[in-house]
Regions:
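Glycine-enriched, solvent-exposed interface loops adjoining structured elements
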Residues: 1-226
Length: 226
């Protein structure tokens, strides 16, 4: 797990912007640039996380507000026993479930075809995608951004901060127009490269996984090659 904090990333962004002493960009602007870069990164390469939750009551609706940064649920096993000494295979994959949001809080609805419903103290094993976090940013306690992608976030944040500065300068009387153009060119170049790298990550994620996923079973008109 990375030990990088928001202060570390903020310092790196300021170095890239040649403003080590924060004479031009304040912390709020830099932090917002980091947020924007993380948000774009999270859409291109969300983190895959697995956890087990114990149900507080009976029912098909399961509150998932304890899962920080949740974006999508990608898999659910139920029934599941984390204390079992023998593996259950194939696992009890739930084929029908829906994630919806109630006043901004995620709720998982389990559409179990056999009529059964989860009971209190049952365990669910859940796979989900989440946005990356940086220690100290918006209350995050740990950094979940892979260390090898920190430089990518720094570049994106610098681009966002530069473009924010351009907006500020354009609205200031007596501003050196040439300086604004140069700064805007720098900001756009940083963001262009940042988004190109995100496209590469997105393409790489699409190529992962098994050749054939789960699908319809064979019927009497189908055949399988050996």
């Amino acid at each position: 797990m990375s030990t990088t904090t928001i202060a570390d990333l903020r310092s790196r962004v300021l170095v890239l912007l040649m403003d080590v002493g924060s004479a031009i960009w304040d912390s709020d602007t830099i932090d917002e640039g980091i947020r924007q870069a993380l948000a774009e990164y999270g859409k291109a390469r969300p983190l895959g996380i697995e956890t087990v939750i114990t149900l507080p009551g009976d029912g098909r609706e399961v509150a998932l507000d304890s899962l920080t940064g949740l974006q999508e649920v990608t898999g659910v096993w139920w029934p599941y026993d984390s204390s079992a000494t023998m593996e259950t295979w194939p696992p009890n994959k739930i084929k029908g479930y829906t994630l919806w949001w109630d006043d901004g809080q995620p709720v998982l609805f389990l559409n179990v075809l056999d009529g059964a419903q989860p009971q209190q103290d049952d365990e669910l094993r859940i796979w989900y995608s989440a946005a990356p976090e940086i220690t100290g940013l918006d209350g995050a306690a740990v950094t979940t951004l892979p260390a090898w992608h920190e430089s990518l976030i720094v570049a994106g944040a610098a681009g966002h901060a530069a473009m924010s500065r351009v907006v500020d300068l354009v609205e200031t009387a007596g501003t050196d127009t040439y300086a604004v153009v140069v700064l805007g060119t720098f900001g756009r170049a940083q963001l262009k490269q940042f988004r190109y790298e995100l496209d590469q990550l997105r393409a790489g994620e699409a190529r992962k996984g098994s050749s054939w996923g789960a699908g319809w079973g064979l019927d009497k008109w189908d055949s399988a090659r050996e």
